[in-house]
């Protein structure tokens, strides 16, 4: 039996709510572009994101005072969680919609 923490369940539920009611952008290169324009509220990166891209995202997010959350799973895990048949390395949150994902992540 796989143990799933309560925090993980709430994160996954809020991520699904975010995808239904909010506005997000997938992809590291697009994330960097939108971070530079300060049009992002938060960025979620997969733990397996390539090092140079992760450093760029962290650097520009720090300059723009945008929080970055590192998802513990791989890009494939994040893609599956988002209901996509492909890997997702980065999710940029433009509008959180009805989800409380920003609050949940800030609590961590």
Swiss-Prot record:
One of its GO terms (cellular component) is cytosolic large ribosomal subunit. Keywords: Ribonucleoprotein, Ribosomal protein. One of its GO terms (molecular function) is RNA binding. The keyword Ribosomal protein applies. The keyword Amino-acid biosynthesis does not apply. One of its GO terms (biological process) is translation. It comes from the Archaea. Transmembrane segments: none annotated. PROSITE patterns: RIBOSOMAL_L30E_1 (PS00709), RIBOSOMAL_L30E_2 (PS00993). Pfam families: Ribosomal_L7Ae. Belongs to the eukaryotic ribosomal protein eL30 family. HAMAP family: Ribosomal_eL30 (MF_00481). This is Large ribosomal subunit protein eL30. It comes from Saccharolobus solfataricus (strain ATCC 35092 / DSM 1617 / JCM 11322 / P2).
């Amino acid at each position: 039996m796989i143990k799933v923490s309560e925090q993980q369940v709430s994160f996954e539920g809020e991520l699904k709510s975010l995808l239904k009611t909010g506005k997000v952008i997938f992809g590291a290169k697009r994330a960097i572009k939108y971070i530079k324009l300060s049009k992002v509220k938060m960025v979620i990166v997969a733990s397996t994101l390539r090092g140079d891209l992760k450093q760029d995202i962290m650097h520009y997010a720090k300059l723009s005072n945008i929080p970055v959350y590192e998802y513990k799973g791989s890009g494939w895990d994040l893609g599956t969680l988002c209901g996509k048949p492909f890997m997702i390395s980065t999710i940029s949150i433009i509008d959180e919609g009805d989800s409380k994902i920003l609050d949940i992540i800030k609590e961590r």
